[in-house]
Regions:
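Short, charged amphipathic alpha-helical "coupling" segments at sensory-output junctions
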Residues: 2-13
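STAS-typified acidic loop motif
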Residues: 21-43
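A short, well-ordered alpha-helical element
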Residues: 36-56
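Short, glycine-/small-residue-enriched flexible loop/hinge segments at domain edges that mediate gating
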Residues: 51-70
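Short acidic-hydrophobic, aromatic-tinged amphipathic segments that line or gate anion-handling sites
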Residues: 111-122
Length: 140
């Protein structure tokens, strides 16, 4: 039983990877179904990594989330508020047309939460926010 609990905890931890993309920028890709237990783990993991890396921006990519209901949307809002309290701006990326429509139909206001259509847009926005940009180098 203890071994099973350990394995379950490891699986949950692996399902919420937070990685550093750049100085002050973290990425948290969320894949699969999100319930309240998982959201709690996502929040705890994100807040700890923000502290560890002294991050100023967290990209929360939800492209891999198949559906969002009002509970999940409210949890995402809570995560962005918690990160803001730590001095870190959250950027939600990967909002599909279906999720966008569901949020509108549910009457959920994202308020002042920063959103970008794609992860690429979120990375560009984050770099610009820090006064940087990616540039193509001509090697000819």
């Amino acid at each position: 039983e203890a071994e099973r609990d350990k394995q379950q905890a490891l699986i949950m931890e692996m399902s919420t990877p937070v990685m550093q993309l750049w100085d002050n920028i973290l990425l948290l890709p969320v894949v699969g179904l999100v319930d309240s237990k998982r959201v709690q783990l996502i929040m705890e993991t994100a807040l700890q990594k923000i502290l560890d890396y002294q991050a100023k921006l967290l990209i929360l990519d939800i492209q891999g989330v198949p559906a969002v209901d009002s509970a999940v949307a409210n949890h995402l809002i809570q995560i962005t508020k918690a990160t803001r309290l730590m001095g870190c701006t959250s950027i939600v990326t990967g909002i599909s047309p279906e999720i966008s429509q569901a949020l509108v139909n549910l009457g959920i206001e994202l308020g002042d939460i920063q959103t970008q259509a794609t992860l690429k847009d979120g990375v560009s926005f984050s770099l610009a926010n820090l006064g940087m940009k990616l540039q193509t180098i001509n090697t000819n």
